[in-house]
Swiss-Prot record:
Membership in a protein family: Belongs to the class-II aminoacyl-tRNA synthetase family. HisZ subfamily.
GO biological-process terms attached to the record: histidyl-tRNA aminoacylation; L-histidine biosynthetic process
Family matches, as PANTHER family: HISTIDINE--TRNA LIGASE, MITOCHONDRIAL-RELATED, HISTIDYL-TRNA SYNTHETASE
InterPro entries (UniProt xref): aa-tRNA-synth_II/BPL/LPL (IPR045864), HisRS-like_core (IPR041715), HisRS/HisZ (IPR004516), HisZ (IPR004517)
Protein name per the record: ATP phosphoribosyltransferase regulatory subunit
Gene name tied to this protein: hisZ
Principal location class: cytoplasm
Summary of subunit composition and partner proteins: Heteromultimer composed of HisG and HisZ subunits.
Pathway assignment: Amino-acid biosynthesis; L-histidine biosynthesis; L-histidine from 5-phospho-alpha-D-ribose 1-diphosphate: step 1/9
Keywords from the named record: Amino-acid biosynthesis, Cytoplasm, Histidine biosynthesis
Any further remark recorded for this protein: This function is generally fulfilled by the C-terminal part of HisG, which is missing in some bacteria such as this one.
Organism: Agrobacterium fabrum (strain C58 / ATCC 33970) (Agrobacterium tumefaciens (strain C58))
Pfam families for this protein: tRNA-synt_His
């Protein structure tokens, strides 16, 4: 299949990136697979094109740019703050559309003014789209994983359940299934008798050895799946979580929170009212939320065009705070999306914590909207 043609508006994109004082970065198409498998989430994991080197190293075709850009930043020991831009192909298995397509975007690393940096990426994404799609009305949906994490923590759930719920944030079907299993827990079934016995003993090392042996005997490749250690730990976690029940009151509060939605000018009041009714201490998360709203307003953003959704997230595990998407008003086709990922660079090997936020533009979708203007 031929590669997708470079979009005709690529020059305008590069002009926008230069005007925003970004450094354009190129990253290899072939990437080490492990960072994506570990940190990008199940949704992207299923879409990755996998391969391996002659030495057996797991590799993949570049499925997105954020992780490669961060890895390059770490490898080159570049100081911060630093703003990177990119324009290139990504490769994902998709039900609709080509599996190879262009993305462009900006990654903003190291700015310690979190609210200002968050506001800037939303403004940059919408401003670039307004140039590429003149006369089109845009709508922004904004969520906040930090607020969701604060609600889950304030409810006093075990850390294992907090982690699972946070990982499912943004996927309502998965969240609903998890909440149902919390309210009506079911014992683990269908386990190999030997695995069940080893789980009962709590001997992780022996369980890992057994799983490794079984995987080798059956030819089950760890290049396309989890390692024996990962599987063992997930099984142990599932066993512990299966014994946990969420009180009805906490379940109702979570459902109420996830149903919250409001135009951004009213969102702070809506969240504050919820916290007061639920008697949950969310001060830190709500303060950060309020600062971001103020930064957007101070930058001249029409807050009425932005909708806050408490359940809104994006299907990538590395987000930690702001998440957002931009669509043409009246459409559900995402033209730009991004968010904050403050833990990612440390997980990838950075020696110090580097706050980070960014966004990607879906160029094939932008091209389709531009094409719809033509007679």
């Amino acid at each position: 299949m031929p590669l997708i043609d470079m979009p005709e508006f690529a020059g305008e994109l590069l002009e926008e990136f230069a005007a925003r004082r970004t450094s354009r970065v190129n990253t290899p198409v072939i990437q080490p697979a492990e960072p994506f498998l570990d940190m990008a989430g199940e949704d992207l994991r299923r879409r990755i094109f996998m391969t391996e080197s002659e030495t057996g190293e797991s590799l993949c075709l570049r499925p997105e740019f954020t992780i490669p850009v961060c890895l390059r930043h770490i490898e080159t020991a570049t100081g911060t703050p630093k703003r990177y831009s990119y324009l290139g192909e990504v490769f994902r298995q998709r039900r609709e559309g080509a599996s190879e397509f262009y993305q462009a975007g900006i990654e903003d690393l190291g700015d310690t003014d979190i609210a200002a940096a968050d506001a800037r990426v939303v403004i940059d994404a919408t401003a670039i789209l307004q140039r590429l799609l003149p006369g089109r009305s845009l709508a922004v949906t904004l969520g906040d994983q930090q607020v969701f994490e604060a609600v889950v923590a304030a409810l006093g759930l075990p850390l294992g359940w907090q982690k699972r719920l946070v990982q499912a944030f943004g996927d309502m079907a998965q969240l609903d299934a998890l909440l149902e299993s919390l309210v009506h827990p079911k014992p683990m079934t269908g386990l190999d008798a030997r695995v069940a016995g080893l789980l009962a003993t709590g001997d992780e090392a022996v369980l890992v050895d057994y799983l490794d042996t079984v995987m080798q005997e059956t030819g089950y490749s760890t290049n396309a799946s989890r390692s024996p250690l990962e599987i063992a730990r997930r099984l142990r976690e599932k066993l512990a979580l299966a014994a946990t029940r969420l009180p009805d009151e906490s379940f109702e509060l979570l459902k109420q929170f996830l149903a919250l939605q409001a135009p951004l000018p009213q969102a702070s009041q809506v969240l504050g009212d919820f916290a007061a009714r639920a008697k949950l201490k969310l001060d830190g998360a709500l303060s950060a939320f309020d600062k971001r709203v103020a930064a957007l307003a101070n930058a001249g953003v029409d807050l009425e065009t932005v909708t806050y959704g408490a359940a809104f997230g994006r299907p990538l595990d590395y987000y930690t705070g702001l998440v957002f998407e931009v669509v043409e008003a009246g459409s559900d086709s995402v033209l730009a999306g991004g968010g904050r990922y403050d833990r990612l660079l440390t997980l990838l090997g950075a020696q110090e914590k580097i706050p980070a936020v960014g966004f990607s533009l879906w160029l094939d979708r932008i091209k389709a909207v531009r094409g719809s203007d033509k007679p």
